[in-house]
Amino acid sequence: MFSILGNSSKKKRNTQIYRIFFTLTFSLSNLFLAICYLFLNVRTVSSDSSVSLYDRQLFDQSSSVILNPDTSDPSIVLSSLETMRDLAHDIKFGQDVLEQPLCDQLFVLMDGKDYPNTIRSMSSVVLASALSNNFIAQKKALEMNIMPKIVNTLRQENHPVTLLKKLFLLSKSVQSFPLSEAFISKDLGSAILLQLYDFWSRNSHIDIPSAFQEKLLSRLSIIFENIARSLENVNFSKASKVIPIEWVFSTWCSIFQKYLMNNWHLRSISTLEVLLNTVSTIQSVSESCPEVNFYEWLNDKNLAYKNKLIYQDPDLATEFNLIIKEALSLPWPKKYNI
């Protein structure tokens, strides 16, 4: 009997020890979490809870270098631009990029022929990051009349890689309908892009790889797809009375349609996908795509398999057949005799 009582009291002591152990473990765990929480939030700026003190210091330091590029090594200027590019994805910092004199200085770097192309290209990407999906930054850009500056910097560019980065900036700008309208309204923007496309797609550019020409067309395609998407929440018939959008869409959609029909079996999958999606988006918004034989070409049941890369990959074939099917379901003009 004493043995039984002794075992019972021992079990109680063990139970108490386990409880104390787990209580201490749980408390230490909570203490660790609390310390981590304080560590992560100690950097918060009291005046602006949306950004941290550390990030604000990074932004200000980068801005100081960018505003005085000639006093720093080019590698430091490039590093500062890369830092600002990353920070500009934040809504607050994106707005700050559009403040003066920083915004104007980015255009100075973009067009400065004495600066390395890496710096010129990254300056474009910083502005693109600031404008991407940032309504307030886009509104500020419109108030600053930024579009003529973007068009002008495109007109001056003669370096292939830097040109692509500047087109990337334009593609982010025209996500907003007011900026799309500013780009198209005087037909200045579209005319510049036609000149660029004509110049860089000539056969005389034997030193320019075909891969660049594909990237150029893809970037142009994305620009007009974004313009079309910016019209989705706008009355298209009213918009077309204000800006020459029908002519612009018709001109560029014809270029994209002809390229698809003439180069389907030759070009990369990504290029074909981008162009086909752009044609579909323009057609769904405006019904402005003019090539009469495009629907017949698109309606070929074996179309996807006429590209070797698609033919060799069943998953790609399935994906492209879905894209083609979606394109065929659009409201094509009556002249297609559907």
UniProtKB/Swiss-Prot annotation:
Membrane disposition: Single-pass membrane protein
Keywords: Membrane, Transmembrane, Transmembrane helix
Main location, first listed in the record: membrane
InterPro entries named among the record's database cross-references: ARM-like, ARM-type_fold, Hsp70_NEF-Inhibitors
Transmembrane domains' residue ranges: 20-40
Compartments (UniProt record): Membrane
GO cellular component: endoplasmic reticulum; membrane
Gene Ontology biological process terms in this record: SRP-dependent cotranslational protein targeting to membrane, translocation
Gene Ontology MF annotations: adenyl-nucleotide exchange factor activity
Name of the protein this chain belongs to: Uncharacterized protein C1071.03c
Species, as recorded: Schizosaccharomyces pombe (strain 972 / ATCC 24843)
Lineage of the species this protein comes from: Eukaryota, Fungi, Dikarya, Ascomycota, Taphrinomycotina
